[in-house]
């Protein structure tokens, strides 16, 4: 609202909130830091878990940064940017979501200190951009190359990703499953590996223990055999995949058939029966003894299939059909008349088994499966969900190493190395930007400091010891949170893909820079319906944040 000769001039609608300059920056920085502080305690092998309860009473227990932020109903626009950091990190690297968010929060904290010293945001932004660029170069220079067939390194990286999650007791076993699964679906082209992790299916079933989790060299489908007269087990299976219904199709036009005598009705029914029998005969003729159908199977067709001893499954999801094709080598056929013996896939065994009281179809023993399934077991729904998240992280980490062939030491070693090298770089740059680069370097120490804090160690004492040891012994020295001492992380098997660290620095610095660029927040008044809905839910119309962050 402006004033002209004492007369107010309304530019924005009534109820619109506006924060300008330092107020806007402070508010945005505070909101982003609250998000970082929320996930900070989950970082590292000794990190704690969060229990999230939604409006329906559903509970999620996890220490996965991306899941925590995804489950939280966040309103503040700057805080939502931090959620995007976690999502991007998860999508691009698969791990390091908490690291990225914590670094972004610390970069903003250090930036605020510079703003309080009257350093212009543009200078801070320029310094941060230079530092982020230099950090990428430093990470490339300290990364260690590994061969794709180095199973020990892949195993250690997968174990590092699983450590600290609910599945930790079985981390070695789960890491082996993750490595094996990725290696099975990996495709080599011109000496480089490409992994599509959509070809690894995670099927969850409560019951049993985490150690009962299994890798199936094929596909597990949460369906059952359609007819009780069909075989429940078929060895040396020849598999047909049909993307159509085994039913008599109805005409798409509004056609009417006028039947005037019982003979005509009988002829009509016989023709229907004949068409269905021809479909089943075609399946038998090409030599298939197992058939997966994406749509329905008529009762009469079921009868004929059972009579011929063919195992059939209906209403199979499209994604499962594609995985079956990749695992067995079968081709998905749209028109059953086009089915040929060459379209059939093969598997050692197709069997219906009871898992946790429910029937499931196991297609296993595929020769060279390019799609596999990990059947996850665990005592409760929450355990099974957290094991799935741990395995997803492990699988993505192994994928990163196979594709890039580069690793880096974990345990805060990379961040300490970056901090030391960026401090040196800041002196070369000089000017006011030097202060911003030094702030960036200082912000990276939040990772080793948080690892120590979460392990119950004295953060300052531990950090001083680790930095001294790091300068003396080299870039692989980090914090061993179990011993509380500096240690060579490569020797201890704490390994991460370089992609995870590079993406974390990239995402965190970009988010911090974007938030620092904002000097004006104009928030429109919420719609009446939304406001009414929030009255009972403790919602707030404005974006003001309050926190005890120092």
From Swiss-Prot:
Asked if the keyword Ligase belongs to this entry, the reply reads no
Record's InterPro entries?
A: Chaperone_TCP-1, Chaperonin_TCP-1_CS, Cpn60/GroEL/TCP-1, GroEL-like_apical_dom_sf, GROEL-like_equatorial_sf, TCP-1-like_intermed_sf, TCP-1_chaperonin, thermosome_alpha
Compositional bias of type Low complexity: which residue ranges?
A: 541-550
Region Disordered, annotated ranges: 529-550
Keywords attached to this Swiss-Prot or TrEMBL record, sorted alphabetically, are: ATP-binding, Chaperone, Nucleotide-binding
Q: Could you give a GO molecular-function term held by this entry?
A: ATP hydrolysis activity
* Subunit record text: Forms an oligomeric complex of eight-membered rings.
- Biological function: Molecular chaperone; binds unfolded polypeptides in vitro, and has a weak ATPase activity.
Family, as annotated: Belongs to the TCP-1 chaperonin family.
Q: Which PANTHER family match?
A: CHAPERONIN
> What is the name attached to this protein's record?
Thermosome subunit
